[in-house]
């Protein structure tokens, strides 16, 4: 009886492996930052859009590995002022950076932020 139960368990495990069971979630073959592109036409100072031309990016979302790409950006102004914003870029949804060309009378001097990452 023990041999029979062991045989059934092994057979089920083999079928599960053949059928793609187990942890089929693999990391994407593309870095999150490669799936977004800066778009100067979004908002007053720009934003980011999904890069539809990258098949690996589209596949990453289509297969459910991630919802999209998380973005965190900081716009810096003269006088030490800054405005931060965060959002998700995904197919059909852009991320518009908060801020403008000036803030409290101070000109924008730079924009930057954290490395984009896959948002699950």
Curated annotation (Swiss-Prot):
Residues 1-19 form the signal peptide. InterPro entries: CellEnv_BiogenAssoc_sf. It comes from the Bacteria. It is found in: Periplasm. The keyword Signal applies. Its main location: periplasm. The keyword Signal applies. Keywords: Periplasm, Signal. One of its GO terms (cellular component) is periplasmic space. Induction: Transcriptionally induced by CfaD and Rns. This is Protein CexE. It comes from Escherichia coli.
């Amino acid at each position: 009886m023990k041999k029979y139960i062991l045989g059934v368990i092994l057979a089920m495990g083999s079928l599960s492996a053949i059928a793609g069971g187990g942890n089929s979630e693999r990391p994407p073959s593309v870095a999150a930052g490669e799936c977004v592109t800066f778009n100067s036409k979004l908002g007053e100072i720009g934003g980011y859009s999904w890069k539809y031309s990258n098949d690996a990016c589209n596949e990453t979302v289509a297969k459910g590995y991630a919802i999209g790409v998380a973005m965190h950006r900081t716009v810096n102004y003269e006088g030490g002022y800054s405005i931060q914003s965060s959002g998700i870029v995904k197919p059909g949804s852009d991320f518009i950076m908060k801020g403008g060309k000036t803030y409290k009378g101070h000109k924008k001097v730079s924009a930057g932020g954290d490395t984009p990452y896959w948002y699950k």
